[in-house]
Amino acid sequence: MKPRPPAPLESQHLPSETKGVPAWAPFTHRTFTIIWLATVVSNIGAWMYNVATGWLMVSLDANPLTVSMVQVSNTLPMFLFAIPAGALVDIINQRRFLIAGETAYTVASMAFAVLVWLHLMGPASLLILSFLVSVGSAFTAPAWQAIVTQLVPKPELQAAVAANSVGINISRAVGPALGGLLVVSFGLGAPFWINAVSNIGVVAALFWWRPPIKPVVPLPAESFSSGVRTGLRHARYNPYLAATLIRTIGFFFFASSYWALLPVVANRQIGGGAALYGVLLGAIGAAAVGTAFVLRGLKSRLGANWLVAVASVMTGVATALFAVAHGPLTAIAASLLAGASWIFAVSSLNVSAQVSLPDWVRGRGLAMYVTVMFGALTAGSALWGQLATSWGVPTALFIAGAGAVLAVPMTWRWKLQLGEQVDFSPSLQWPAPVTTHAVEPDRGPVLVTIEYKINPNEREAFLDALANASNG
């Protein structure tokens, strides 16, 4: 559901039992509706915050590398903490975990707003606080993905996922434009306060929510360190997840370029203000919302593998348009193309990750996917910022665009899995034990044998001890 990572689950290719469920079915469940509304409001505040942080850094230090570090500080926590967070999600109470993480996010956001309001924010403190705010998102992201099945019945899962995606894309379309308008009208501090206040509704909704009681399993709880090791081991030997991760790197590493450098493009290359920056981000979100209406048909015609390939080529074209944009219209066209390509890739990769995982390791597997995604975004943002500082913004964007196109043939051998033929249910086909006589349920011969391996030098002592035991 929530927040800052791309839509957690998004596709029309979930198991066949979800087919035919109305799109509005999840909203017949009060819990889903309340949490959905709270997260949409919070995500609008988060996108206002994203606009404000990028523009605040431009006003403090317009160096492309420094500006791109804002994107790095926002994505690095997800890379560092998603795997341990995923292990915790599979072990501890998910509701309490979300309450703690969202409360920490709210407190950090309020601290950010206070420092901006008091004019105490500099480039270094902005990056540090951006990192701390994003830590809350990093720890809660796997949990938000994992609780969807607790909010609606399984046949309605696909509709719930689609509703979540619509909510996230609505916030992406509305939030940046409102953020830019707030900066122009009320100053840079306003979006930070709204972001902090908007998340209070999420915390309240989580306190109110009472998840269904699960049957108690009489097994010892898995330890945190063991959970992390098990998740990493599963990811290593799951070929379906491995293919998803490789394709994820191939897309997000190059797509990170325009996210990292868009404030510089809007300010230095086009000569616009915060309002233009908000419009460009809003155009990306609006394109994602519009594309969602044709996504089902495109997936059925092209399939996930081709859809991600098309998304990579579209990203290359969009990045090249950003490189040559010297007016708002070209930049807006690039944003629309980038938004459509983003939703093509994210929808296919998210679902491929979901259906490639069994339930018992789902939180950790999704955390691995999130880690790889944000690792690619983090590394890419830093690289494109450095190249833009050394060779210029247009050159860096052209290189990123060419890389996005070349990534298609380089990663094509790894096919995405949409899960129709993947069965993760436990096998019950165990071989029957070999018996010398028929065994009745209430009687029958039972023979237990115990073998001992004894040092030949201690043979006599062992026989004496065995004789004493049998006589005792």
Pin down the residues of each PLM region.
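C-terminal transmembrane bundle of multi-pass solute transporters/carriers
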Residues: K2-L9, V70, L80-I83, I91, ...
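Juxtamembrane intracellular "pre-TM" segments in multi-pass secondary transporters
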Residues: E10-T33, P212-I246
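Substrate-agnostic recognition of the 12-TM MFS/MFS-like secondary transporter fold
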Residues: T31-N50, Q71-V89, N93-A108, S125-V184, ...
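MFS-fold secondary transporters
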Residues: Y49, V58, A111-V116, V133, ...
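Small-residue hotspots at the loop-to-helix junctions and early N-terminal turns
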Residues: Y49-A52, L56, D61-Q71, A162, ...
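Transmembrane alpha-helix termini and helix-breaking/packing motifs in multi-pass membrane transporters
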Residues: G54-D61, F112-L118, V174-I194, V264, ...
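Helix-loop junctions on the cytosolic side of multi-pass membrane transporters
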Residues: A146, Q150, F192, A196-E222, ...
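Short amphipathic alpha-helical segments
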Residues: N457-G472
